[in-house]
A protein has these predicted regions:
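A short, compositionally biased domain-edge/stem linker segment
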Residues: 31-37
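Bacterial N-terminal signal peptides that target proteins for export
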Residues: 5-8, 15-30
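Exported/periplasmic ABC-transporter solute-binding proteins
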Residues: 35, 45-67, 73-80, 84-90, ...
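N-terminal signal peptide c-region/cleavage motif recognized by signal peptidases
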Residues: 38-42
């Protein structure tokens, strides 16, 4: 095809005052298109996801990159931290929050529209203890139980004012009438994985995390699961921040049957 085009174009064109053959123009145009194609295919999709999504998203990242010959960049932190970064202009294409509030926050800021967000996953709130030095008392999740006397160390969870797991934890502790008795023994962390690590290392005797995080560690065991009535439903919404074609393809992949199977494997419940 290249040779036939060269033979067909025997005329010359003027370019910026210089005489240039169509053959030269053809080569330059072809090179530009090739470079543009390479640049397009090399563009990375960026997902900002709640820390509790780390293992599931890492697995999906590998699958997506192989399937689409694409590159995916990940950023994991507390949903509050990620939402504020996106508000300030961080280059995220997709955002998965561990609660509705931080997705609502971005929608109110005009960073995501109602038509480009969906409730994706659910989770459970659990109480954990270190495997090597577990509490000895059996915990009962009712208002008459003396939680303060049940353990001697610290209780760790996310920041109770901003980090979703911490907010859920505070709701549960208040509804069980436990908050006032143990709030002074609370260690608040930057995200749920930090709380998990505190308990894993034995620095906190108890921790409140998601069931999926507890399942990801061999160094903690679940003492019990908080009743659903003690806190708001744990919902993970997904939002598309950048609405270009590549971002849309990635956004839709994260809701595909293949992705749902991975979420279930890691202990999440699928809401759609």
């Amino acid at each position: 095809m290249l040779e036939s085009l060269q033979k067909y174009f025997s005329v010359f064109v003027k370019c910026k005052g210089k005489i240039m053959s169509v053959k030269s123009v053809f080569y330059q145009t072809t090179l530009a298109l090739v470079l543009a194609s390479i640049s397009y295919s090399a563009a990375a999709e960026t997902i900002y996801a709640a820390a509790s999504m780390t293992d599931a998203i890492n697995e999906l990242k590998a699958k997506y990159e192989k399937k689409h010959n694409a590159k995916v960049k990940t950023s994991y932190a507390a949903s509050s931290t990620l939402a504020r970064q996106i508000e300030q202009g961080a280059s995220a294409d997709v955002f998965i929050s561990a609660d509705l509030a931080w997705m609502d926050y971005l929608e109110n800021k005009g960073k995501v529209s109602a038509t480009h967000r969906k409730n994706l996953l659910g989770n459970r709130l659990v109480l954990i203890t270190p495997v090597k030095n577990p509490i000895k008392t059996s915990i009962k999740f009712d208002k008459n139980f003396n939680i303060d006397a049940a353990f001697t160390g610290k209780l760790c969870t996310g920041n109770t004012n901003s980090v979703p797991v911490g907010k859920y934890a505070k709701q549960a502790l208040n509804n069980l009438n436990w908050w006032s008795s143990i709030s002074k023994r609370l260690v608040e962390t930057e995200d749920v994985r930090a709380a998990l690590n505190f308990v894993s290392r034995g620095e906190c005797q108890l921790g409140i995390v998601y069931a999926t995080d507890a399942a990801a560690s061999k160094n903690v065991k679940v003492v019990g699961t908080f009743p659903l009535a003690t806190h708001n439903p744990i919902v993970y919404p997904i939002g598309m921040i950048n609405t270009d074609a590549n971002s849309k393809r990635f956004y839709e992949y994260l809701q595909s049957n293949e992705a749902k199977a991975v979420y279930k494997k890691h202990g999440f419940s699928v809401l759609q």
